[in-house]
Curated annotation (Swiss-Prot):
Protein's UniProt keywords contain Acyltransferase: no
Chain sites annotated for binding Mg(2+): N200, D214
Keyword terms: ATP-binding, Ligase, Magnesium, Metal-binding, Nucleotide-binding, Tricarboxylic acid cycle
Record's protein name: Succinate--CoA ligase [ADP-forming] subunit beta
Subunit structure: Heterotetramer of two alpha and two beta subunits.
Residues annotated as binding ATP: K46, G53, R54, G55, E100, Y103, E108
Gene name tied to this protein: sucC
InterPro entries the UniProt entry points to: ATP-grasp, ATP-grasp_succ-CoA_synth-type, ATP_grasp_subdomain_1, Succ-CoA_synthase_bsu_CS, SUCC_ACL_C, Succ_CoA_ligase-like_bsu, Succinyl-CoA_synth-like
The species this protein was found in: Neisseria meningitidis serogroup A / serotype 4A (strain DSM 15465 / Z2491)
């Protein structure tokens, strides 16, 4: 689960991090009032969406008057912002953050942290190249990224934070200020089950003070059950409608840009299914894992979910019956096809537990369902049907 910038800054500020001041506005009048309250020579109006690349997409604007703040806010709120991290439809802008005047600054730094899967520990990354995408820095000048791996038994040590401060070129009081900032960030990371933390840029102001000009936080969704206050911050308007609906039925769904819907049990088999569709010249429209313990109701909902995507021209159902029985899946498929007006070809491949019984149910249903003998055959049949 992602947080908006204003939510991330509020959370980080509660852990003692120095963040850029800002006021949330939901309309032009509120943005103008926020500009007056901040009282600087200029302000920055930032669209609040769950996506990076806002500046290049026109979602971050410098304003020099209350009238301009109102005008920019009204031009953003109610629209969809399309960035390199969104799909073609973009993300809806429901509010803007009017931020205080902090420039010019001495320099812009970068500080971020993730859970490193290779070490299975929290790893901090810092760089002197702030204000640009860290991916670009990693690709072009990887030597400018400094990494610190934290031992979970002892936590982040002050000496580790000081070493990073030295590498960033900080001096005197800035070093202690940075140690406090990085320590607070680690505490926030652990206590709130972050999956991602990023401050870009971390500005060194003209007076030498540090300030988090931006803030990006991703929360581990698996931990939301123990984070009720964080869960309340969820903005469902920023999530794909079908992915949101899928989560309500414990389905793992990711929308893609193809035209062949996929329903599979097991993430590995789902990825293999998408691979072979591509190999045969097709384009998968989604990743959909109904899980090893799929129930009849979940399969029906999964089928509905796939067909809600108007770009879907055919459906491939690939089920390996291990825990789940193929006859139960077959009954669910028949029920879903009868309930929904299915006007696209459906190819079904069943293997494993009660596969023969499942195939019998499909064949005797009287519905236009095509059985496949193996994954290769299934992929060839659905690609041919879609291209027919």
């Amino acid at each position: 689960m992602n947080l908006h910038e204003y939510q991330a800054k509020e959370l980080l500020a509660s852990y003692g991090l120095p963040v850029q001041g800002g006021i949330l506005a939901h309309n032009g009048e509120e943005a103008a009032a926020a500009y007056d309250k901040l009282g600087g020579k200029f302000a920055v109006v930032k669209a609040q969406v769950h996506a990076g690349g806002r500046g290049k997409a026109g979602g971050v604007k410098v304003v020099k008057s209350r009238e301009e703040a109102k005008e920019v806010a009204e031009s953003l709120i109610g629209t969809n912002l399309v960035t390199y991290q969104t799909d073609a439809n973009g993300q809806p802008v429901n509010s803007v953050l009017v931020c205080e005047d902090m420039y010019p600054v001495q320099t812009e730094l970068y500080l971020g942290a993730v859970v490193d899967r290779s070490t299975r520990r929290v790893t901090f990354m810092a760089s002197t190249e702030g204000g640009v995408e860290i991916e670009k820095v990693a690709a072009e000048t990887p030597e400018k990224i400094f990494k610190v791996t934290v031992d979970p038994l002892v936590g982040l040590q002050p000496c580790q934070a000081r070493e990073v401060a030295f590498q960033l070129g900080l001096k005197d009081k800035q070093i202690n200020e940075f140690v406090k900032l990085m320590t607070g960030a680690y505490k926030a990371f652990v206590e709130n089950d972050f999956a991602l933390f990023e401050v870009n840029p971390l500005a060194v102001r003209e007076n030498g003070a540090l300030a988090c000009v931006d803030g990006k936080i991703g929360i581990d969704s698996n931990a939301l059950y123990r984070l009720p206050k964080i869960a309340e911050l969820r903005d469902k308007s920023q999530e794909n409608e079908r992915e949101l609906k899928a989560s309500e039925f414990d389905l793992n769904y990711v929308a893609l840009e193809g035209n062949i819907g996929c329903m599979v049990n097991g993430a590995g088999l789902a990825m293999a299914t998408m691979d072979i569709i591509k190999l045969k010249g097709g384009q998968p429209a989604n990743f959909l894992d109904v899980g090893g313990g799929a129930t009849k109701d979940r399969v029906v909902e999964a089928f509905k979910l796939i067909l809600e995507d108007k770009s879907v021209k055919g459906v491939l159902i690939n089920i390996f019956g291990g825990i789940v029985r193929c006859d139960m899946i077959a009954e669910a498929i028949v029920a879903a096809v009868k309930e929904i007006n299915v006007d696209v070809p459906v190819v079904v491949r069943l293997e494993g537990n009660n596969a023969e019984l499942g195939a019998k149910i499909l064949n005797e249903s009287g519905l236009k369902l095509t059985s496949a003998d193996g994954l290769n055959d299934a992929a060839e049949k659905i690609v041919a049907a879609v291209n027919a």
